Amino acid sequence: MADDHRQPEASSNTAANPYNHPVASEHTLGSLNTTSTSETDASADADARWGERNQGDPVSRRGAMEEFEEMRREVTKLSLHRTRSAKDARRRSRAEGRDEEKALEDEQASSTDEYRGGFDLNEFLMGGHLERRTTAGEPAKKVGVAFKNVTVKGVETGASFVRTLPDAVVGTFGPDLYKIICRFVPALHFGKRPPVRDLLHDFSGAVREGEMMLVLGRPGAGCSTFLKTIANDREAFAGVEGEVSYGGLSAEEQHKHFRGEVNYNQEDDQHFPNLTVWQTLKFSLINKTKKHDKASIPIIIDALLKMFGITHTKNTLVGNEYVRGVSGGERKRVSIAETLATKSSVVCWDNSTRGLDASTALDYAKSLRIMTDVSKRTTLVTLYQAGESIYELMDKVLVIDAGRMLYQGPANEAKQYFVDLGFYCPEQSTTADFLTSLCDPNARQFQPGREASTPKTAEELEAIFKQSEAYKQIWNEVCAYEKLLQDTNQEDTRRFQKTVAQSKSKTVSKKSPYTVSIVRQVAACVQREFWLLWGDKTSLYTKYFIIVSNGLIVSSLFYGESLDTSGAFSRGGALFFSILFLVLQLTELMPAVSGRGIVARHKDYAFYRPSAVAIARVVVDFPAIFCMVVPFTIIVYFMTGLDVEASKFFIYFLFVYTTTFCITSLYRMFAALSPTIDDAVRFAGIALNVLILFVGYVIPKQGLIDGSIWFGWLFYVNPLSYSYEAVLTNEFSNRVMSCAPSQLVPQGPGVDPRYQGCALTGSELGKADVAGSRYLQESFQFTRHHLWRNFGVVIAFTVLYLLVTVIAAEVLSFVGGGGGALVFKKSKRSTKLKAQNGKGNDEEQVQNTGDNAALSRGEAKSSSSGEAMQRLSASDRVFTWSNVEYTVPYGNGTRKLLNGVNGYAKPGLMIALMGASGAGKTTLLNTLAQRQKMGVVTGDMLVDGHPLGTEFQRGTGFCEQMDLHDNTATIREALEFSAILRQDRNTPRQEKLDYVDQIIDLLELEDIQDAIIGSLNVEQKKRVTIGVELAAKPSLLLFLDEPTSGLDSQAAFSIVRFLKKLSQAGQAILCTIHQPSSMLIQQFDMVLALNPGGNTFYFGPIGPEGRDVIKYFADRGVVCPPSKNVAEFILETAAKATKKDGRAIDWNEEWRNSEQNRRILDEIQQIREERSKIPIADKGVEYEFAAPTWTQTVLLTERLFRQYWRDPSYYYGKLFVSVIIGIFNGFTFWMLDNSISSMQNRMFSIFLIILIPPIVLNSIVPKFYINRALWEAREYPSRIYGWFAFCTANVVCEIPMAIVSALIYWLLWYYPVGFPTDSSSAGYVFLMSMLFFLFQASWGQWICAFAPSFTVISNVLPFFFVMVNLFNGIVRPYKDYPVFWKYWMYYVNPVTWWLRGVISSVFPSVDIECASKEATHFDPPPGSTCQQYAGNFVSNIAGVGYLVNPDATEDCQYCPFANGTEYMHTLNVHDGDKWRCFGIFLAFVIINWALVYFFIYTVRVRGWSFGMGYLFGGVGVMIEGVKKVFSKKSEKEQN
């Protein structure tokens, strides 16, 4: 191993090249060589490819194009069937031995063209639309990749313990902050650093232009790491040693100047769900096409759509798991098309066929083959389940295990290399499966007698390979490639650089990696933002509806406001809320955070700078916010009776608009700086509360500066305070308010008007009028001289927020670089398991234990597992279905998704459900499992000839395609939860737990049974999904939807083999499967094959080696080629319009008229007749749920408590908010005195608790929504637990944290403010605080229980906040309410009663002492004292207040309140309200809880809509009309 880094002696001799390519010539297809003006007759040898007629002569582009029509079929044959290189005698001889297969596949290739609507990929590529070509027709961008001695370093990620609530709380006091700081300033990191290990070890090789390399290895072996390294995506690695070059360009130069030319297509499909397929592709091309070439964009889009068979989805939303859009397979094709739209020269594809059926996967691979050949691209692919047809399309293969290179070389030599080492390849195994199995100690097989001598570990296999001739050939090729570059003076590379430079816009620097200028990037992102707005019309309309509603509500509350002094304070309130309500919505945070992964990928593709997105959102904000502000300001301004002077209105409009823009920018800044959406909501919510508190409305400016010694400075950094001063001074400037009669002091008989004062701050002695400017100066210290200064300050804040956002978008990256290691719960057993599982092999999600194919260890323990299998609950009942049809509403009509499907499931029978993407496989499973929630299902589904009973769903297991679990539970906890709640209620609990032990043992999950499910890899989660269903002992049938999707071939085989054992033990199984290998399909007994539209084209036995299926199609003139995968043959045959006697075969009709179908129908009828005669055993009472409701509730409550404990962000967020708001509230109003302003501050201090719900509800709603979604999707359909248990558990789990949060908030707020310390008052307020925290939790839950979607909830929440904030008698006194609101809204507002109760408890004990400026000043008539003149007024007319200086003869001062009781009466709070309000508020809390139960049952279980469908029906008609108008415009634009 010491010589690993030494290059073996490389020869420049042509013969040393393992591919027989002359060193000085290009490695190209013979077919393509005809298009080069520099080719010789050696390029078109005896194999007779392109240019045969002109052999020996240079072929011109014109001549080649004249021959193109005749030649393109030959190119297709060359491209698709691996007889590519005329110079490769070994490959040619191999192809010549397969004449029959080639003939058949040529016929299928021609049918492929018909299937794609006549689209010819070769012709399209040769046309030069997707990339530039030379005058000779050659691709202008040709770049090969060479890598020498590459070692990739990664941080060691061992198994760890789950982070719990105490860990999060302790982390707040330093450790978490320290980690964040060290992330950006590594020099501050002290102590032991995490160890660094090799992810890849000493890789060398070359992939030349026009070549395809298949990278094979099990998940975690290093395949994704290798692809990312080649794609120059190194951010997630600790370091990369060695050299990677791209046509002679260094990795550094490539990343800096040509980043978009080398791309990595990740496994997951991340797109903006509200964009259509056409918009997604157009956006990609806009950013990769300069203005001069923009006419080619529609042509390329059309070609890409045809290429991948998704033309019909052109105007369909891409969608995701929450937004309905294209299917999963179609979404994968969109991802592929988007990557091709980058026009890159080197592309690395990471498991891009996941979710595609075998036929589509093969079509995709063929398309890559053609593009690689014709465009001379360099292509690297990793596939987990590669069929032989796909493997034969590859030039090279690289086998990786544990980060080590086991083989690299020609694909057609790999199998023999390992056979020569002593490995055995089973006859039915594909080459890719065989090569992958070498990495699995439990799956690989050795030749008899060579078990000991054959190398086994990754290190041994690597060492053997590096001593082999194949490794020397690698170095020969690397040296030959480098010599070629040197001899040609890097001609191709220089042409590549020149072509890339020419493809850029004129305004873009030639050294920039981007194609278009920042202006065009922003313009494209602006267009996309408008598309996103229009694509989510429900949210858009909901938002504007709420805005208009809030405007009407606010203005109606202040409608008819008096112009005299009595309306001064309320007018200030109206202005305050008018600048506040538009910024209450935190909906901007979600898209800003959730789209990060997409933006990061687009940055790697060199589409645009991340800052372009931030700038584009600002640009879109201008019209979007304008459209929000216009209706709102018009409604509020004129309905509240503000000054109708034009200049004042437009100034008001300007500040509302600017403020909304500013705070929206603030939200985006927090989103850009926050790692998660939870953090963004938390910090933005806290910031909003601080802005409201320190705006100068709750506490006047001077009070903040002088009295709030800790936080008063926040007034100066608060943009809302400047806006509030501006709109307030704008309204009150030049306004003179006459004193309201009720505010004249004194009043009554004998009072001389000349000796009266006005009870409003700012009034002057002896004057009955009050100047608005003086009122503002005295009350708020506001002046209109600051108007335009304030405008400039708000603009400055906006610019600051935008700058921080733009910089953060460019600098910060919160996108993870791969999966993590296993995470365990804290226990003694898991401590040992953690130590065993601390090592991994890749920066990807590693296979820690329970590795792929671990189930293959069944041979070692076959006896014990066989006995355990026999103990599984087997049934002799038979499930039959006949003429099943399923129809759903579609547009103005209906669409049939299943059409007359027949079949049966017997014990011991394993049925494969197959079909192309969108054929209806999952639909059929859901229909048979009685899980459809909409549409009409017809047909007969019977068990033993009898109708399905209430226990049917409980007697079946259903494994979803998506592994839906509580991600915070451990494997054992999930299985025990399923077993206890789903097995028969009469089974002892210990017996159920013992059964779980058997399942864990059978599934080989012992070593990771205490691992958190959220940390598992794909294959482990799939086994847990199966285990959860097996733990329920399904007595009838086990449904599985794509159990092998996303798994490598060995993991897929292990899963299916385990299912086979279950089937042999008596379990009936119906399983959908996408890409079964030959070995995989042989595990099934029967196959039910569907075509699109839910039409059956075959149902029957597979037969040994697929003979029964092959015979069925052979009888109809379609012969399966020898060694062809039967599953692939079925799908490909059904997908293509195969010719028979000059006509196209309708396979659906063929099946309906076949003898096999008649036999199946007869058998179903026979089963029904025979089984229906068997008497039904008396089972007693049939229960919908196996476990009693009490057991369901207790177990679910325990699980939810564990979930909140192990996912601390939820509980921690509540504690964090309580602490922060409590501190700000308590210490801002620190130890209030007894003045009137302090009484007002007491009132607002109590009132400020309503600032907590907007933050808390934004965390309650997502948590409840996620749990509700899991219950609706899996746990309720499986009848694990019912609606009552779900509601009760969610309600109970909120109570402890509500009490703790209330206690923390109360301690930090109540005593610092200086409220009464007697136990009666303090205890009562704590009790009310606890009820309030319980109220807000249940409030959020019932809203979420009722609302149809999370988006609607987010937009509706502000409406509720407005209602409870306004109609409680604080913002506007109850006596001034308009009649419409006065007699109902005030009383149905729960917050009203909370405020009245708390105020009635803490106010009465306060004796008020007026400050001089708070008293009303007036002079008594000459010769009278204040008491003599105004005593009667105070005692009999006013009945409240007192004279500060009764004996004075001038400047009398009247204090309007003598104590807190008199003050609270103005708030409509009475002496006896205390316990009455407690009882009423408690009733509201109970009603909230009742509503949770009510809406979950009625809406989620019963499906009631409460007329919402009719309400929005008219809106839907209007929307459709608008859509038609815009769709016509869109079609014109696309054409």
Curated annotation (Swiss-Prot):
Q: Which organism is it from?
A: Aspergillus flavus (strain ATCC 200026 / FGSC A1120 / IAM 13836 / NRRL 3357 / JCM 12722 / SRRC 167)
Q: Show the ranges annotated as biased composition (Low complexity).
A: 34-45
Residues bearing carbohydrate: 33, 149, 274, 287, 351, 892, 1459
Going by the UniProt record, its keywords in alphabetical order are: ATP-binding, Cell membrane, Glycoprotein, Membrane, Nucleotide-binding, Repeat, Transmembrane, Transmembrane helix, Transport
Q: Where is the composition biased (Basic and acidic residues)?
A: 46-76
MF GO annotations? ABC-type transporter activity; ATP binding; ATP hydrolysis activity
One Pfam family hit: ABC_tran
Q: Which InterPro entries match?
A: AAA+_ATPase, ABC2_TM, ABC_trans_N, ABC_transporter-like_ATP-bd, ABC_transporter-like_CS, ABCG_PDR_1, ABCG_PDR_2, P-loop_NTPase
Q: Ranges for the ABC transporter domain? A: 185-427, 879-1117
* UniProt binding sites for ATP: 915-922
Q: Which PROSITE patterns match?
A: ABC_TRANSPORTER_1, ABC_TRANSPORTER_2
Family the UniProt entry places it in: Belongs to the ABC transporter superfamily. ABCG family. PDR (TC 3.A.1.205) subfamily.
Q: What is its main location?
A: membrane
Q: Which reaction does it catalyse?
A: voriconazole(in) + ATP + H2O = voriconazole(out) + ADP + phosphate + H(+)
From what superkingdom does this record's organism come?
Answer: Eukaryota
Carries keyword Transmembrane helix? Answer: yes
The name of this protein is ABC multidrug transporter atrF
- Name the phenotypic consequences of knocking out this gene: Leads to voriconazole sensitivity of the yap1-mutated voriconazole-resistant strain.
Its function, per the record, reads: Pleiotropic ABC efflux transporter involved in the basal level of azole susceptibility. Confers resistance to voriconazole.
Upregulation details from the record are: Expression is highly up-regulated in the presence of miconazole. Expression is controlled by the AP-1-like transcription factor yap1. The promoter contains a putative Yap1 response element YRE (5'-TTAGTAA-3') from -462 to -456 relative to the start codon.
Q: Which gene encodes it?
A: atrF
Q: Where is this region: Disordered?
A: 1-115, 834-868
**Can you name a GO cellular component term?**
plasma membrane
Write out the biased-composition intervals (Basic residues): 79-93
Residue ranges annotated as transmembrane are 540-560, 573-593, 618-638, 646-666, 680-700, 703-723, 791-811, 1212-1232, 1246-1266, 1295-1315, 1320-1340, 1342-1362, 1384-1406, 1477-1497, 1503-1523
